[in-house]
């Protein structure tokens, strides 16, 4: 006999009509924290915390998505002041290793100079400006030589050679070191900031998020799949498509069977970080009364099947829940795959979708079952396009030998994410669904007689939080690199 999906009795604060702005929650459904509290293995403090703040309910102007002048202001004011994920430490493990990172018109050679010394050099010859390394390139170098006239620099940034130095008596080679951006490393991620006056990365992120990230130990993971694709929309629209679970029931109906979408939790941390927690292995409140616990269990099979190494379909015992069966199964499979004891790892960490955004363009999904990274970068030549990257991560093997990080797979505009070698087909379908909406949204905003986006107070608070940060930086003066102040050693 089929067992109807179990519904926890919800005590959602503010679910009643007339609640203060931002306090209304999905009526008749348990909160995310109530679902997690019922789990067999308790969740840690960083999971059990809440940090919502009502940020207003006015429309968001559409100009920021469709006006070329807005994109120019972003390059002059926003991208020159914010911390950005440039590469992983594993991309440049040896001294001399480098990878080129571009953002808009700016380009940097991210280089390992010493075991604990990573630098970000402006990717331009100080003679007549030619790029020292091509965009998208990587490798290992003993010097950076210009392909035009042959001027060269050591990997520590000092000038190595000026061809026909006799013709440049006015040039002091001691002052000819490559200028640099600021660099910091956190969780194996290399961040850069063009602004020399920018706060330290820890201050930019805030103490609470820093504590969360320290708990994940992402430096002990490696990138096993890296997929990139150009999207036909403004970079902010692409980011905002992933900031809420409100779209799940319409855009991903196949997932709603096992996703607590309308009762997901949304948090904001300071100016630059926000989060949602979306519980999995539970039925969407939109579908209450329409599915059994076995239906939930049957659907909830998306994820990194390659890492799990087990394709068997689980079944539900009498009185059991899909969520608990999946937690037990995931725990056992990951213990076997990683030769580790996960008995103290909470059910929530094993199952649920945790999505953190670091402004302006970096997503971290630190869950055990499918840790991922998203990065979005605007196209410097067309504000209606952006580059979307998905990086999937796995634990470093128990023998400590770190595999080589995956080379990026660049999909054509007309290709499905499912065509990327190594992509889980179910998850690839979800990414296709997410991104297929974006061209229609970009065109719709340009055609609309309504010049604003209307947002929900709770479920879309991350969109508003993100756009408030955009507004903060665009209210500042343009900031361009000043070579007289740039550090060089």
Regions found by a protein language model. Give the residues of each.
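Rieske [2Fe-2S] iron-sulfur-binding domain
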Residues: 2, 92-215
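Short Pro/Gly-enriched beta-strand edge/turn motifs at strand-loop
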Residues: 80-93, 162-167, 356-360
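Short, solvent-exposed coil/turn linker segments
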Residues: 61-62, 87-88, 172, 200, ...
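Short, flexible segments with low predicted structural confidence
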Residues: 41-50, 155, 208-211, 347-348
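N-terminal short leaders/motifs
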Residues: 40-69, 133-148, 177-187, 299-337
């Amino acid at each position: 006999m089929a067992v109807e999906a179990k519904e926890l009795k919800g005590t959602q604060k503010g679910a009643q009509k007339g609640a203060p702005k931002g306090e209304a929650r999905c009526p008749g459904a348990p909160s995310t924290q109530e679902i997690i509290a019922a789990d067999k293995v308790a969740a840690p403090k960083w999971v059990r915390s809440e940090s919502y703040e009502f940020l207003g309910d006015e429309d968001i102007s559409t100009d920021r998505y469709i006006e070329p002048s807005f994109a120019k202001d972003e390059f002059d004011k926003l991208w020159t002041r914010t911390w950005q994920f440039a590469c992983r430490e594993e991309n440049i493990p040896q001294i001399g290793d480098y990878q080129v990172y571009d953002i808009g018109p700016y380009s940097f050679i991210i280089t390992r100079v010493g075991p604990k010394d990573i630098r970000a050099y402006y990717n331009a010859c100080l003679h007549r400006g030619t790029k020292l390394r091509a965009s998208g390139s990587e490798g290992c170098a003993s010097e950076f030589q210009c392909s035009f006239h042959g001027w060269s620099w050591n990997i520590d940034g000092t000038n190595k050679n000026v061809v026909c130095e006799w013709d440049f008596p006015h040039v002091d080679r001691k002052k000819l070191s490559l200028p640099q951006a600021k660099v910091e490393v956190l969780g194996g991620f290399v961040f850069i900031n063009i602004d020399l006056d920018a706060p330290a990365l820890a201050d930019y992120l805030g103490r609470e998020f820093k504590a969360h990230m320290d708990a994940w130990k992402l430096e002990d993971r490696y990138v096993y799949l890296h997929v990139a694709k150009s999207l036909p929309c403004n970079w902010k629209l692409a980011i905002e498509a992933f900031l809420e679970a409100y779209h799940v029931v319409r855009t991903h109906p196949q997932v709603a069977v096992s996703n607590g979408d309308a009762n997901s939790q949304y948090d904001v941390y300071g100016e630059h970080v926000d989060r949602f927690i979306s519980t999995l292995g539970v039925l969407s409140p939109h579908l209450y009364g329409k599915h059994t616990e076995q239906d939930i269990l049957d659907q909830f099979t998306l994820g990194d099947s390659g890492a799990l190494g087990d394709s068997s379909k689980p079944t539900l015992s009498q009185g059991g829940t899909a969520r608990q069966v999946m937690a037990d199964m995931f725990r056992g499979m990951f213990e076997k795959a990683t030769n580790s004891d996960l008995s103290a790892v909470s059910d929530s960490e094993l199952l649920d979708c945790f999505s953190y955004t670091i402004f302006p363009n970096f997503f971290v999904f630190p869950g055990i079952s499918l840790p991922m990274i998203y990065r979005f970068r605007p196209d410097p030549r067309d504000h209606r396009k952006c580059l979307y990257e998905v990086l999937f991560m796995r634990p470093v093997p128990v023998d400590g030998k770190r595999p080589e990080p995956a080379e990026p797979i660049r999909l054509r505009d007309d290709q499905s994410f499912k065509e990327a070698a190594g992509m889980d087909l179910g998850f690839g379908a979800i990414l296709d669904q997410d991104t297929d909406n974006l061209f229609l949204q970009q065109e719709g905003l340009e055609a609309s007689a309504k010049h604003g986006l209307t947002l929900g107070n709770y479920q879309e608070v991350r969109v508003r939080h993100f756009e408030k940060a955009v507004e903060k930086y665009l209210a500042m003066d343009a900031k361009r690199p000043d070579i007289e102040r740039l550090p060089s050693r």
